Regions:
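Contiguous, amphipathic alpha-helical segments that mediate oligomerization or scaffolding
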Residues: 15-59
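Generic hydrophobic secondary-structure signal
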Residues: 45, 49-52, 56, 76-78, ...
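Ser/Thr-rich, low-complexity intrinsically disordered terminal regions
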Residues: 61-84
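Generic hydrophobic, helix-prone segments enriched in Leu/Val/Ile
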Residues: 6-13, 65, 88-93
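Intrinsically disordered, low-complexity regulatory segments enriched in Ser/Thr/Pro
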Residues: 3, 77-128
Length: 142
């Protein structure tokens, strides 16, 4: 085999192996991210939202915290009894970015709160964001 042909084949193989390794690392990183989110969702987000929900329910508000079985997202809905509108806040994975996207929808507006790395999703963060959301919801009633 000619040397230039041999080198071309070896270069193509090396390029493939490099891309394949990068893809495998990307898949491992995504698995780590999804696993990390599953743990944070169960041990941080849901308990933090439930703590807020207890306080709101005691004050007469309807508050539902839901986590999908197949969908890894979380949704919290807060509304006053008999209200037609059911404002909600969601936590959804942005797998391409390895972040969690938080959206909020109230009677007046719907917009992303932002995208956050897993290490930003703490109990304090979750409760602060849902409190801001509730403040908006409460101010729009009446």
């Amino acid at each position: 085999m000619r040397k230039d042909v041999q080198e071309a084949i070896e270069n193509a193989i090396a390029g493939f192996e490099k891309r394949h390794q990068a893809e495998q690392e990307r898949l491992r990183e995504r698995e780590r991210f999804e696993s990390g989110w599953a743990q944070i969702r169960t041990t941080v987000v849901l308990p933090a939202l439930e703590e807020v929900a207890v306080v709101l329910r005691k004050a007469g508000w309807q508050c539902e915290v839901r986590a999908g079985e197949k969908d890894p997202g979380v949704q919290v809905t807060i509304y006053w009894e008999g209200g037609g509108e059911k404002p909600f806040m969601t936590y959804q994975l942005e797998k391409q970015k390895n972040t969690v996207l938080i959206n909020a929808a109230t009677k007046a507006s719907a917009a992303p709160v932002g995208s956050f790395a897993l290490d930003k999703i703490t109990e304090d963060f979750v409760q602060t964001e849902v409190t801001k959301f509730f403040t908006r919801v409460a101010s729009e009633i009446g």
